[in-house]
């Protein structure tokens, strides 16, 4: 299973990823003590602004599996619209978000980049540890 710290790896995992492992596998892999996701379905396509599971440190200092919306608040000078790729981690706007208390693990089994092919459509290219993307 691939995993990425939100604060560090946004540039790797662009705007589409999948999670085909079940809750038990996620809890075991990341040693999440609490599961607050409810009945989590297989998520073959997770896009920005959608809810998806993350593993974070809870109020009791234990790891917990919870749902979170994908995206970070954007800089006010750019309208505050949510962003999904943080390339300038030295930007004053994002410095506070990089603190350990704001970090989490985003479980993923594969992620997608788009190949720059002829318009009107770009070709999706999936990356995973296994060819079957599971």
Description of each model-found segment:
Residues 1-134:
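Short linear sequence motif anchored by a di-proline
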């Amino acid at each position: 299973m691939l995993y990425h710290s939100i604060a560090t790896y946004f540039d790797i995992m662009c705007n589409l990823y999948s999670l085909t492992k079940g809750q038990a596998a996620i809890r075991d892999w990341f040693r999440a003590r609490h599961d607050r996701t409810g009945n989590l379905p297989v998520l073959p396509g997770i896009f920005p602004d959608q809810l998806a599971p993350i593993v974070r440190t809870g109020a009791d200092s234990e790891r917990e599996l919870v749902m979170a919306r994908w995206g970070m608040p954007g800089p006010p000078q750019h309208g505050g619209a949510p962003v999904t790729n943080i390339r300038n981690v030295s930007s004053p706007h994002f410095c506070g978000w990089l603190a350990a208390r704001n970090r989490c693990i985003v479980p993923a089994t594969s992620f997608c980049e788009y190949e720059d092919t002829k318009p009107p459509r770009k070709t999706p290219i999936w990356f995973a540890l296994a060819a079957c993307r599971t």
